[in-house]
């Protein structure tokens, strides 16, 4: 059937067709090679925006540092980072005046969090810069390595298990004259293979102790590792993102906790809420501006874009904000919160892997590590790279670049939102003291500004004043990329507003289709995505029905499980046909076993096993869901599982789907070609953690697991839990006296061993 595409849009307002312009179909672009060039761009740009600031030298590390705070006010529209301290403090004071008690209350909430947070909070998150190995690691491993090194250097406050105590160790570690670390390394030997008589390379993994003096340790503690941001759609150029080490993470977490608590109380903040809640918040602000501008005023909205938000923010400004927001709080609390911005003012950016060179004529490839960029002859590089290296050289120390100004992506989203909202707050008539006034929305670097005034001149004046106010706080509204419209049509964080929010369906496209976890999860996720889009994204019944049929088709193709009565030949069709013929009630077979699809848009909320349970043959039920069947027993049965969805914007989100453990919920094994590399020692550590955590979960199944209050180690918790459970089981007659005594004996032995340790 041929469709003339223009017919699709005849009755659709232009805004509703916005979906079709988004770059969300197909694979997103990934980066290859090193991020060194992108990182140098970031460092150079950041310094350029602050170039008229004051240069100083860090006394501990010798790093040159540029401080643009209270620098000269810009005379043109170029982006700049010269925030004025007194202006920022005044904006904070006005924010507090409009929201009495906001800082005080948020501080009280945060103090409670600080005292209760366990150090395992830092195991969340994926890649983390591991300063002990000088490269990226999974967060849990990086934390473990840090704690291990701390303990071997006599720093033991962290043993309490509280995050605040771990941070005490971090502070102490910075005063130490030297730190001893264990590094993994790899030895290669050429040996003759006894069987084949060929020479082979044998690799052995070793650990060796290394001492870092105070300067080297501080550089590592203040380092942010950089990588290229992958899978960014709609951009030609890649860009660098940073991942901080464990010394910085805990402090950042507490600052962001305070800022999050403040954002929750600000009606103009687009964080930390999301989805429908965010849309409701937005709609409220728009409604407020529309109702107040009925007869005498006109109202315009700017869909705003800021130039290089992160690179013009400054940690010193954040320090001023924190100092103000916590001014009546206990000294210890103010100190804890001020450390993150201080560390960021002294941060170092690791330049990544370096450059790859290849000589076509000599068939040679070689890598120039970042450490060599400081003194390598520049004749090997092309012009643009040469300029980059020349500009960055004065800032280099041991392969890292001193980067005092700027914030790096994604570190202080909440706190920078507070800064943005403080300007929106100044738009009230009692502050503008004139006929125009403004309000708006801020979510990290994205904003929408609504200006009301009696006439166009007033609107222009209001926008100009907003623009200049932003400059005073180191925020640069881009005149090229922002556009203004009559209120009622604007875009904010990829939500399109036209007298109400228009569904931007293309955002959801990447999550349709078969996820590739396993047959059971994929079926469940597939129908859940369709259900969610019917609820949230204007996916109509006819389209949903079509999406469902396409999904089933895709699913059958992926898992080669076409219906038992089909003519299609696949690797599985022989087995599936056999099962089809043996089955009395064919409707009871799961789609993944060659059964028919019983889903329609009315029953998407029911897991397939439940939908078909009554229709199944008894022996099929017995095979499918029998815990004694070795293909089922590995799965703990939980009612809800989480899948990680990659939405179009924002971080990966967790999507819940109903999970019924069956023979189809298998877990694939990971490829372990890692075993003969220097990662192997790390892997063994990781497996040890995995085992400990699995054991712990056996004692505390998720349903009964409450965060341990008070300070007890994992072992103590498990022993006391074992004793309680054993007593209950013994008293209710589930276990015999001998078993009970044996359990008690084992518990005592474990405690004895701990005492001896």
UniProtKB/Swiss-Prot annotation:
UniProt-annotated stretches for the region Disordered: 53-82
PROSITE patterns (alphabetical): RDRP_SSRNA_NEG_SEG
Gene Ontology cellular component annotations, sorted alphabetically: host cell cytoplasm; host cell nucleus
Source domain of life: Viruses
Gene Ontology molecular-function annotations: nucleotide binding; RNA binding; RNA-directed RNA polymerase activity
Enzyme class: transferase
Reactions listed under catalytic activity: RNA(n) + a ribonucleoside 5'-triphosphate = RNA(n+1) + diphosphate
Gene3D superfamilies reported in the protein's UniProt record: 6.10.140.720
Span of the annotated motif Nuclear localization signal: 187-195, 203-216
Stretches assigned to the RdRp catalytic domain: 286-483
Post-translational modification: Phosphorylated by host PRKCA.
Enzyme Commission number(s) of this protein: 2.7.7.48
Reported function: RNA-dependent RNA polymerase which is responsible for replication and transcription of virus RNA segments. The transcription of viral mRNAs occurs by a unique mechanism called cap-snatching. 5' methylated caps of cellular mRNAs are cleaved after 10-13 nucleotides by PA. In turn, these short capped RNAs are used as primers by PB1 for transcription of viral mRNAs. During virus replication, PB1 initiates RNA synthesis and copy vRNA into complementary RNA (cRNA) which in turn serves as a template for the production of more vRNAs.
Family listed: Belongs to the influenza viruses polymerase PB1 family.
Protein name: RNA-directed RNA polymerase catalytic subunit
Organism, as annotated: Influenza A virus (strain A/Hickox/1940 H1N1)
């Amino acid at each position: 059937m041929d469709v003339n595409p223009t017919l699709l849009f005849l009755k659709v307002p232009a805004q509703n067709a916005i979906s079709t312009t988004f770059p969300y179909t197909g694979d997103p672009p990934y980066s290859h090679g090193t991020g060194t060039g992108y990182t140098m761009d970031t460092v150079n740009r950041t310094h350029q925006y602050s170039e008229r600031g004051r240069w100083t030298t860090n006394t501990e590390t010798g790093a040159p540092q540029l401080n643009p705070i209270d620098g000269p006010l810009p005379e043109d529209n170029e982006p700049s980072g010269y925030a004025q301290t007194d202006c920022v403090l005044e904006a904070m004071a006005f924010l507090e005046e409009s929201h009495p008690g906001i800082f005080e209350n948020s501080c009280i909430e945060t103090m409670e969090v600080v005292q209760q947070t366990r150090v395992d909070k830092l195991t969340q998150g994926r890649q983390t810069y591991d300063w002990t190995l000088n490269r990226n690691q999974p967060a849990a491993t990086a934390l473990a390595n840090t704690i291990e090194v701390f303990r071997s250097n006599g720093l033991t406050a962290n043993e309490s298990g509280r995050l605040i105590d771990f941070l005490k160790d971090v502070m102490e570690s910075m005063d130490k004259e030297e730190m001893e670390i264990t590094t993994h390394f790899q030895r290669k030997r050429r040996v003759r293979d006894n069987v084949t008589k060929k020479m082979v390379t044998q690799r052995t993994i070793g650990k060796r102790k290394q001492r870092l003096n105070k300067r080297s340790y501080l550089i590592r503690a203040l380092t942010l590792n950089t990588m290229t941001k992958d899978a960014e759609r709609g951009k030609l150029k890649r860009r660098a993102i940073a991942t901080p080490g464990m010394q910085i993470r805990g402090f950042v977490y507490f600052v962001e906790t305070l800022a999050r608590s403040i954002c929750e109380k600000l009606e103009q903040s687009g964080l930390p809420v999301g989805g429908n809640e965010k849309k409701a918040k937005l709609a409220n602000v728009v409604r407020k501006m529309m109702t107040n501008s009925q007869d005498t005023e006109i109202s315009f909205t700017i869909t705003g874009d800021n130039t290089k938000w992160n690179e013009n923010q400054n940690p010193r400004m954040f320090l001023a904000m924190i100092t103000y927001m916590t001014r009546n709080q206990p000294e210890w609390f103010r100190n804890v919160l001020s450390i993150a911005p201080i560390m960021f003012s002294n941060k170092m950016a690791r330049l990544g892997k370096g450059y790859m060179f290849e000589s076509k004529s000599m068939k040679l490839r070689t890598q120039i590590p970042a450490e060599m960029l400081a003194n390598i002859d520049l004749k090997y590089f092309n012009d643009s790279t040469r300029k980059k290296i020349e500009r960055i050289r004065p800032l280099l120390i041991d392969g890292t670049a001193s980067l005092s100004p700027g914030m790096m992506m994604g570190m202080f989203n909440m706190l920078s939102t507070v800064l943005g909202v403080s300007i929106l707050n100044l738009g009230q008539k009692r502050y503008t003291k004139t006929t125009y006034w403004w309000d708006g929305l801020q979510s990290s670097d994205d904003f929408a500004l609504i200006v009301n005034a009696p006439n166009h001149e007033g609107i222009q004046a209001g926008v100009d004043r907003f623009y200049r106010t932003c400059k005073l706080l180191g925020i640069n509204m881009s005149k090229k990329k922002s556009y203004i419209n009559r209120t009622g049509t604007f875009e904010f964080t990829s939500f399109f507003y036209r007298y109400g929010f228009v569904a931007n369906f293309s955002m959801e496209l990447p999550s349709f289709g078969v996820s590739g976890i396993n047959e059971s999860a994929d079926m469940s996720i597939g129908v859940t995505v369709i259900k969610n889009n019917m609820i949230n994204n204007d996916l109509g019944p006819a389209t949903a029905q079509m999406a469902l049929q396409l999904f089933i088709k895709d699913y059958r193709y992926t898992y080669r499980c076409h219906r038992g009565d089909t003519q299609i030949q696949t690797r599985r069709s022989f087995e599936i046909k056999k099962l089809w013929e043996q089955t009395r009630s064919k409707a009871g077979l799961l789609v993944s076993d060659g059964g028919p699809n019983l889903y329609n848009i009315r029953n998407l909320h029911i897991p397939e096993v439940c939908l078909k349970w009554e229709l199944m043959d008894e022996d099929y039920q017995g095979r499918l869901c029998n815990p004694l069947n070795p293909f089922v027993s590995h799965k703990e049965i939980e009612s809800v599982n989480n899948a990680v969805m990659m939405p179009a914007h924002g971080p990966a989100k967790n999507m819940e789907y109903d999970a019924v453990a069956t023979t189809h919920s298998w877990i694939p094994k990971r490829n372990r070609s890692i075993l003969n590399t220097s990662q192997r020692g790390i892997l063994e550590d990781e497996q040890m953690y995995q085992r400990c955590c699995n054991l712990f979960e056996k004692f505390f199944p998720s349903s009964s697991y409450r965060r341990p209050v008070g300070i007890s180690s994992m072992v103590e918790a498990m022993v006391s839990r074992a004793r309680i459970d054993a007593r209950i089981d013994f008293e209710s007659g589930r276990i015999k006296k001998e078993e009970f005594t044996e359990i008690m004996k084992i518990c005592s032995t474990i405690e004895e061993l701990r005492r001896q340790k």
